[in-house]
């Protein structure tokens, strides 16, 4: 039991550090998106557009790609998983449900990540989570 608990905590820590390693890419991609849109518009000189409207649309687009909520919920699920393994035994199904929720947040992060580096990190997070799910089956 103790070895399994240590394995869970190691994998949870790995997911958490991978999630934090996304942040530099997340900040840079917002600026890249803005630059790409501005360059695209300036490459078509005859197009006139309302600059204020463009800023509104860019904010809307960037908000759709924002992953702060997913990161916040994933952090909560990681903490809840830790609390659950620290509590009484017989929590296998509950751990399975929490792992499912972590998977949803990781998948949504991947869907919103339109940058190869971020998607690579998401794949690594999925790999760590898959190992957790395999170990949860040993607890059931």
Where are these regions (language model features)?
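N-terminal intrinsically disordered, cationic/polar leader segments
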Residues: 2-140
């Amino acid at each position: 039991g103790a070895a399994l608990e240590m394995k869970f905590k190691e994998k949870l820590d790995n997911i958490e550090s991978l999630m934090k390693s996304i942040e530099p890419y997340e900040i840079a991609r917002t600026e890249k998106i803005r630059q790409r849109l501005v360059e695209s518009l300036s490459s078509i000189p005859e197009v006139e557009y309302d600059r204020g409207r463009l800023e509104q649309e860019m904010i809307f687009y960037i908000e759709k790609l924002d992953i702060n909520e997913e990161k916040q919920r994933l952090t909560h699920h990681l903490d809840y998983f830790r609390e659950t393994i620290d509590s009484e035994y017989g929590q296998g199904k509950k751990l399975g449900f929490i792992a499912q929720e972590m998977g949803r947040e990781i998948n949504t992060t991947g869907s919103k990540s339109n940058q190869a580096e971020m998607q690579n990190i998401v794949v690594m997070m999925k790999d760590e989570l898959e190992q957790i799910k395999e170990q949860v089956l040993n607890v059931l």
